[in-house]
């Protein structure tokens, strides 16, 4: 009996130990829990630290890459830099998921910047064929327009004909055609003298005359000597008369003959409207005049009554 009891106690003690071991494995002490939580937090902090450093480095590299691509404008160099930066960023951030995402974003930004720089360099370097054609057309048009402008300028620059006609003003009424012919014939041959006459006094002039010389030099000579000179004691004026430009006859445009409209049909013709003359003239209201007859009659009646008395 004693041996059986001793065996039972040993078995119970073994069972308790097993339970204690299991309970120790399943539920550790609070001190051990704190230690384990601290260790885990440290491990996480260590893992996050290289990830953050990798993201900061990637951002700085992206900015530097963009500046370099904008300044240089070469697509090949930007592509090589983006590939090297993406490989280095992927190697440094292989332990963390955030590092891998940032490396992929940086590689995308690098590829987009390289594509933009390549497109800008290609657009600035060589113009499209459509633009070249447009520029060539503009140049050809400008070349064709130049000779026309030169012709217009030559026409404008052509010297105006020198005047041969002189206007003489402020003449007295005593001066005649013979006097002007005698004075101005000393400067050259005179073609014509025009001296308009007053309408109401045909033997008197209007106070001015036109003298036309054969050569423009003679007209200039007469202007020099006679402008401000005196005829019949009065100072006269002499000025050149510019000949008008010959007017070009405009070509007449013959208008087509107008077609005569056919007469309207009989049933559409309206009867001729005759002006109705009023047979009886308009009656005017008679002007009322004061009649003195009744007053005279009264006077007569009174006189007759007085005579009868």
From Swiss-Prot:
GO CC annotation: cytoplasm; nuclear speck
Intrachain S-S bonds: none
Main location: nucleus
Region of interest called Disordered, as start-end residue ranges on this chain: 1-166, 249-309
Pfam families named in the record: RRM_1 (PF00076)
Residue span(s) of domain RRM: 164-243
Keyword check for Nucleus: yes
Entry keywords, A to Z: Cytoplasm, mRNA processing, mRNA splicing, Nucleus, RNA-binding
Biased composition, class Low complexity, residue ranges: 70-129
Assembly, per entry: Component of the active spliceosome.
Function field: Component of a splicing-dependent multiprotein exon junction complex (EJC) deposited at splice junction on mRNAs. The EJC is a dynamic structure consisting of a few core proteins and several more peripheral nuclear and cytoplasmic associated factors that join the complex only transiently either during EJC assembly or during subsequent mRNA metabolism. Putative component of the spliceosome which enhances the formation of the ATP-dependent A complex of the spliceosome. May participate in mRNA 3'-end cleavage. Also mediates increase of mRNA abundance and translational efficiency.
Protein name: RNA-binding protein with serine-rich domain 1
Organism: Xenopus tropicalis
